[in-house]
Amino acid sequence: MKKIILTIATAALISVNVFAADGGKKANETALNISYSVQQAFNADFSDATSVVWTVTKNVQKVDFVTFGTKKTAFYNLSGEFLGVTQYVDYNAIPAKSQKLIEEQYKGYKVGSVIVYQTNEALNNDIDQTTYFVDLKNTDHEVLVRITNSGKAEFFKQVK
């Protein structure tokens, strides 16, 4: 389960252009593939959502949407249980302690996007309830760094 959630967070970070890429066309095309229980859960969890676009994989049902002007992505397992939600945030949203660690450990890297992932702790309490993923780039490499609840900056994945 932890691996699925971390994969979800990574996929969300890498798919920066998901809203622009499909122009919202998938909303009606894939709606029939979304399980009824997931649609009901999503409507209850995010009743004010607009610009809803669903994607189904073999492990999860993902929905990109806008709520109160903020783009978010929610993830549900195939049984309809809410796994978590991601959204892009400003770099200043992560703790100052973490920013300092990133500056020390990743000199020469520039901050790209930052995603906050808020998990359904009731479903899996082995994972931090709130985790930040910071995309860092230099001329040769791109890495994802995970910021834990305790403020630790940990290498998560080599992107390039």
Positions of the model-derived regions?
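Bacterial Sec-dependent N-terminal signal peptides
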Residues: 1-25, 42
